[in-house]
Amino acid sequence: MNIYLGCPIWSFKGWVGNFYPKGTKPADFLREYVRRLTTLEGNTTFYAVPAPKTVESWVENTPETFRFCPKIPKAISHNGKLLDYVERALEFINVMRPLGPRLGPMFLQLPPRYSPSLLGDLEAFLFRMPRDIRLAVEVRHLDWFESPHD
């Protein structure tokens, strides 16, 4: 069994001098991060899809054993029914594929308004996702934690 430990970000200037060595430049944050941690939630992808060149630099600056766990962009997860955004989700997955073995589970964080009444939409969306992609779903509407959904 492999255990991975990480944070949702690596680019935090407040870590310079304690978590990162004193004088570490932002361009070197990822290289320093992977010296201590083995995974990253990848919260930046929630706000914007990275350019392919950015993904390439992530590969170049991390060992093959490192795992990126990108968050599905909010433009997909927070804009209504997921099924309407299947193509955009597949495009996002393809942007992440160059991570190769570094690609860990992806996170689909649902907004608090996404209730169990949309379970059919969620199931249809997940059914259309590639089977080789691991996808974790975070529900936030309180009704998900009530019977019969708990």
Features from the language model and the residues they span:
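Residues lining hydrophobic/aromatic ligand-binding pockets adjacent to catalytic sites
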Residues: 1-150
